[in-house]
Amino acid sequence: MAEASAPHDRAAALLSAGRAAEARELLLATLSTSPDDAQLHYLLGAARHAAGAPEAALASFERAGTLDPTLLAARQGHVAMLVVLGRTDAALAESAALVESFPGDAQNLANHALLLLQARGDAAGALALWDRALGLAPGLEPALLNRGLLLLQLGHTAAAAANARTFVDAHPANARAHAQLGEALLASGEYEAALSAIDRALALGPGPALLHVKRGYALAALRRFDAAREAFDTARSFDADAVDGFRRSLAAGHAAPPELDPEAIYLAREYERQLRCDWSDRDAFLEVFRNALVRSDGPPTERGLLFASLSLPLTPMERLALARAASVHVASSVRTVSRRAPGSGRFRIGYLSPDFRHHVTARLVHPLLSAHDRSDFEIFAYALCPGDGSELRAAVERAADAFRDVSDVDDRAAAEIIAGDRLDVLVDLGGYTLGSRTEILAMRPAPVQASWLGFLGTMGADFIDYALVDHTLVAAAHAWHEQHLFLPQTFFLYPPVSQIAPALRRDEYGLPEDALVLCAFHHPRKIDPAAFGAWMEVLRAVPRSVLWLTDADVDYVPHLRREAAACGVAAERLLSAGREAHDRYMGRLALADLFLDTFLWNAVSTACDALWMGVPVVTLAGSTASSRGAASILGASGLADLVTATPDAFVALAVRLARDTPARLAMQARVRASRTSSPVFDVAGRARALEMAFRAMVARSRRGLPPAAIDAGREAGPGTPAVSS
């Protein structure tokens, strides 16, 4: 028996030593006298695969499996070669057959799970197979490793952490097990434990560069900023290309890769907690944010922090400093494109947006595009997002004279496309919101560039000439980098809504019939502790009242219920509505008695939704544009008495309207009447106001004058807006 197995053993030893060519020659010689030895054919397949001959390896594995169908390793080798050769369907079919034939082989189940995931993206099927494999072999390393990676990709952080702990218990000397545990804990926000796990992984071996990056993230989240910088430097010294690749993987679409800035990383991580209305560490978060704005090397340049800042109690000048840092960083990385002067015919106006899709921006803007005066204006729309098949996307496409989808080209190509249209004015509807591509604007594809609607605040950019605002929206003109173009009455517009679900009932939403319903349909990013505290004061003062919230993409209501209980308000008085189609969303608003606004980042389109449904909106006008949007809308609608100046006044007004039924009903009647009188709801009127603004901006540009503050609502002469030179 020993003599018979000698060629097998020698061939296996040669393969283990990396001597595939010698193994192949030995096996071919042996097969000449033993042509039906399945094990020899299997080993020859392995040798041919190692030598880079997958077709020949496939034939050898197939022959081995034919000779001995129970030789699982040979049949698995055949599947592997089918994958290498790109014959995925055949590989999947054969792998599935192996699962049927060998249901008790854990490794085989794990192999099929990985193939199913890689070839078909079937995450649920892969997880089920790995669960079966681990039921048979609880410590099976490939199953634990790949199952954990998938759970992390799916965002199932708790399950990923549990899987990683099992992995560590089964393989305590395996660095990848500890690294995976660290990554799962990092994703869960357990930063101390994550750091310990990563350090254990690194103690078992030097680890890849990205493990040092993850260590830097954990240190940054723990506010150990100097140590985080050292970890990032170590990662770059190991593999700078891998680190840059990781940064690029974090970029959304065409956005620039984020810097490995420890303070910015901490702020971004902590902001995720703020999004869940978890304010347990808010004071430290705000302290780091403010300190970062005045550090010696300048504020952070991450644009996401600009969006986050709208919901934070920063001063207008602090927001300007952050915006300047971001815009200067953007401008430094690009070159302007060449452009030809606009023609002498109709004004050519472009609208640039990341939200020409099923999004509120498209809902607001497409009627405006249709309403522009085509005798004087030609309208271009540039989409930074791919088509989603929605009616709103189609409506934008129909409303523009020319629609360009630039989502699949790089920034420079997009800027050149825009420049080729020889615009007079390019209006940016995104600002620093998700999906925006500020680099395009920094390349100056249009002679006049303006910011409007999507980002309530300064962009701090030399490449943005004007912000389209109104006199209510701007409380601190000195804290803007752009010149102001003051639109008459209000900066906003809201097209009338006709599709509204009729006669919805409170019991459909779990609302008490006899209670006063205080609506607060805000995304949790807009809810701040001061506003929530004011809402709780109103609830305490009006015992038969409930606060009606709305579902979001983060689980925030449990945090608010805990905050409510701490304020002496029963948690069950906070109710939540699920997501629904737009007609039902509008219809259910009519079930509310009052709408309570947030303080730092007002409701704007949602406030208009409430007003359209006859629900009074109580707001507080702050010192920043994001905290004055609702005041602008209410003032323009003849409802300025719903605007308050202090938190105490906000509470007092809400309580008075809640308690005084005749006053509340009278206010609701005024709100309903405003639908026919408010300029906010007059799309044609808003189009004329914007056209007046466009004419004024272009007139200065064509005369070679720099941008200057323009009041499009106060005419200096017939058809000429007043200009502050």
Q: Where are the model-predicted features located?
A:
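Short hydrophobic "strand-cap" motifs at the C-terminus of beta-strands
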Residues: 352, 521-522, 550, 577
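Short alpha-helix at the nucleotide-sugar/activated-sugar donor binding site of glycosyltransferases
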Residues: 610-612, 635
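Alpha-helical solenoid repeat scaffolds of the TPR/TPR-like class and their adjacent stem/linker regions
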Residues: 1-511, 523, 533, 562-569, ...
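A short structural motif in glycosyltransferase catalytic domains
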Residues: 598-600
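Short glycine/serine-rich donor-binding loops of glycosyltransferases
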Residues: 606-607, 630
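Catalytic cores of eukaryotic secretory-pathway lumenal/extracellular enzymes that build
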Residues: 574, 579-580
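Glycosyltransferase donor-sugar binding loop
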Residues: 383-388, 546-559
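Short acidic/histidine- and often glycine-rich active-site loop of Leloir-type glycosyltransferases
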Residues: 627-638, 643
